[in-house]
């Protein structure tokens, strides 16, 4: 059985790490490289960096900090932000990233997923999905351009359909960003995760809602996700990664202990 992964998420804007609530009202957390180094030393299995305004600004992720991160950490890391072409992806991978993640550009042109997977291999192609639960309809819908509140829009895709579509096109991993839960720290949306797990046959990463160690346990035990991504609880030092992993191990979760 593969070990479950604990993945700190660093949202990047204007060269700094920021964090919002439900993708809004972002506050500055700190500098990118020192935070990355800290999380690697604490025992993170992987890091994810989202340049949150790259797609909505029509630019690619700022490459200068990617190479700096690669120099100071020895764990895999994934970079997302405005990657719209094979050339964009090649540059970011050449600067030291292990994976690239696409979100809004994949919605704009789903063939991008296949082209990237064919060129670089499915193992390094992640598709991020920003999903919002509509209480009126009882359905989950995919959102686009979520890094800019003024441009965020609901797409025609229902989340479960898009999860299946991206797999057909070559996604090697899916990160499910549950927008309703983002930053509120009251737990992952387990019901949604279970539904997605049923149709997701590649590694599935839960994102949005972690507030306690128990929330991570629930995601692994009840929804059988492969990894749990979180930001606020790590940035604000509410949860220490080493202590979290020790707790999960005592609960019978297969986890890499540093």
Swiss-Prot record:
One of its GO terms (biological process) is L-histidine biosynthetic process. Pfam families: His_biosynth. It catalyses: 5-[(5-phospho-1-deoxy-D-ribulos-1-ylimino)methylamino]-1-(5-phospho-beta-D-ribosyl)imidazole-4-carboxamide + L-glutamine = D-erythro-1-(imidazol-4-yl)glycerol 3-phosphate + 5-amino-1-(5-phospho-beta-D-ribosyl)imidazole-4-carboxamide + L-glutamate + H(+). Signal peptide: none annotated. The keyword Ubl conjugation does not apply. GO terms for cellular component: cytoplasm. Pathway: Amino-acid biosynthesis; L-histidine biosynthesis; L-histidine from 5-phospho-alpha-D-ribose 1-diphosphate: step 5/9. Keywords: Amino-acid biosynthesis, Cytoplasm, Histidine biosynthesis, Lyase. One of its GO terms (molecular function) is lyase activity. The active site is at 11, 130. Its EC number is 4.3.2.10. It is found in: Cytoplasm. Belongs to the HisA/HisF family. HAMAP family: HisF (MF_01013). NCBIfam families: hisF. IGPS catalyzes the conversion of PRFAR and glutamine to IGP, AICAR and glutamate. The HisF subunit catalyzes the cyclization activity that produces IGP and AICAR from PRFAR using the ammonia provided by the HisH subunit. This is Imidazole glycerol phosphate synthase subunit HisF. The lineage of its organism: Bacteria, Pseudomonadati, Pseudomonadota, Gammaproteobacteria, Enterobacterales. The gene is hisF.
């Amino acid at each position: 059985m593969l070990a479950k992964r604990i993945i700190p998420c660093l949202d990047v804007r204007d060269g700094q790490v920021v964090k919002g609530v439900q993708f809004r009202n972002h506050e500055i957390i700190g500098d990118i490289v020192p935070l990355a180094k800290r999380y690697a030393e604490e025992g993170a299995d992987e890091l994810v960096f989202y340049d949150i305004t790259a797609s909505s600004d029509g630019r690619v992720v700022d490459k200068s900090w990617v190479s700096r991160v690669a120099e100071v950490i020895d764990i895999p890391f994934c970079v997302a932000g405005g990657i719209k072409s094979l050339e964009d992806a090649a540059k970011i991978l050449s600067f030291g990233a292990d994976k690239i993640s696409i979100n809004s550009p994949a919605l704009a042109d789903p063939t991008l997923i296949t082209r990237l997977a064919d060129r670089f291999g499915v193992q390094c192609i992640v598709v991020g999905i920003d999903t919002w639960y509509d209480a009126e309809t009882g359905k989950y819908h995919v959102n686009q351009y979520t890094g800019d509140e003024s441009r965020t829009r609901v797409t025609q895709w229902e989340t479960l359909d898009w999860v299946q579509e991206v797999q057909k096109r070559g996604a090697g991993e899916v990160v499910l960003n549950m927008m309703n839960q983002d930053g509120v720290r009251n737990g992952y949306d387990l019901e949604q995760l279970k539904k997605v797990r049923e149709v997701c046959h590649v590694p599935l990463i839960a994102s949005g809602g972690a507030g306690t160690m128990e929330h991570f346990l629930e995601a692994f035990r009840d929804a059988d996700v492969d990894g749990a991504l979180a930001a606020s609880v790590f940035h604000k030092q509410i949860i220490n990664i080493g202590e979290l992993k020790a707790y999960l191990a005592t609960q019978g979760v297969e986890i890499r202990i540093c």
